[in-house]
Amino acid sequence: MSFISCNGRVIHYRYSNNNSDQTFLFINSLGTDLRIWDEVVNDLKAFGNILLYDKRGHGLSDLAKPKYGLKDYAEETYFLLENLSIKNCTVIGISVGGMIAPILAHRHPERVIKIIVCGAANKIGNSQTWNERIEQVRLNGLKSITESLMKKWFSPSFTEKYPERVAGYKNMVERCDIEGYIQACEAIRDEDITEISKTLKMPTLCIAGSEDQSVPPEGVRTLSQLIKDAKFEIINGSHHMTCIDNKEIFTEMIIDFIK
């Protein structure tokens, strides 16, 4: 395990330097940690170096200061790139990670050569839905929402085939720091990357799950239309966590895009 201090708070990361000219930076979804990418990484490590990390208040990373916005999450990601001397990367983000990725590219375009956005939109949800979720988690804990989350994350066929894995991801969310989870909810609630997305010029791939109820395909398509020449792909039958729910197709799309 590797750790680094950023603004007096620890970030957990994993960097595999394969002596490649290409580096993949992965940014996780709400309530998860870097382990969600394990199987994808196994398929992509032959194509480049791998950098994964835990967002603030997730996994083994410390909580952020109050009022931590998505721009702050992006800046701590830049801090990692800077301190690991990674000059440029292909950034892959899912859900909130798919909002952080364009922000990073906008603020530090010299560091991002390609963007892959999965299950994200220029605006996810609205204030009412996020405030309701925040209130529920504060009052009843993360266990009160994980059953419904798993149904949104994974298709019935995946759940039937891999019940133990779904149970493991449920445990992952339930063990997330509640304040870290709420801080991320607030950051998503308060962010709209519409104008940022219009400034991006690097090659971009936007991937949607056809059955995604968290971020419907229309939202992902709208984001792709904001980014110059972005490519839009749908994984049929997939729910929100495309990188797990349909890992093989997901990885094939990435490999085709980076070649």
Where are these regions (language model features)?
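Active-site loop/oxyanion-hole signature of alpha/beta-hydrolase fold enzymes
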Residues: 38-42, 51-92, 252
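Flexible "cap/lid" loop of the alpha/beta hydrolase fold
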Residues: 99-107, 112-144
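Short beta-strand/loop motif that positions the catalytic acidic residue
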Residues: 200, 206-208, 212
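Conserved alpha/beta-hydrolase "acid-adjacent" motif
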Residues: 213-219
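Catalytic histidine neighborhood in serine/cysteine hydrolases
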Residues: 221-241
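Catalytic histidine-centered segment of alpha/beta-hydrolase-like enzymes
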Residues: 238-247, 251
